[in-house]
Amino acid sequence: MNARMAPLAVALSLFATTAYAADLNLGTWKLNESKSVIPPGMFKTVTVVFEQVADGVKVTFDGVDKDGKPFHNGFTGTYDGKEYPVVGTPVADARSLKRVDAHHFTVVNKKGGKPTITIDYVTAKDGKTRTGTYSGTTAEGKPVSATMFYEKQ
């Protein structure tokens, strides 16, 4: 390799490393109801926005609940498994994020220190879709499970 090619090789290497390290979850995700398995009692539509912030990731949920009423909730945290306060939802007062790998992370919702709903998210290799597998209990204490299919906008 000649002296002119070395800087190019270093630049390409740094670009590839940065691209690989990028968080595939960042951006706006919209629920595709027709590809999802949603039981009665869960929200009807939802858009989730993941934004990079100085101290981690800010996650905002906007949608329509089972009664047709709009909802908004969110939190800011990191993928460290620690609990972070959440506002705007009856099923949780805290959430934690834990990254399994570049394409898989888990969210645990807690109310009063007890787990309510756990969601395992798997993002497709192309980063354009992801599936969330929900399990746990509703705000009323009833068991619930669902499979949500999201598309990146």
Language model segments and positions:
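Positively charged n-region of N-terminal signal peptides that target proteins for export
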Residues: M1-P7
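Hydrophobic small-molecule pocket/channel-lining residues, especially in calycin-type beta-barrels
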Residues: A21-Q153
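A detector of low-complexity, intrinsically disordered, Ser/Thr/Gly/Pro/Ala-rich segments
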Residues: A3, F15-A16, T45
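Bacterial N-terminal signal peptides
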Residues: P7-T17
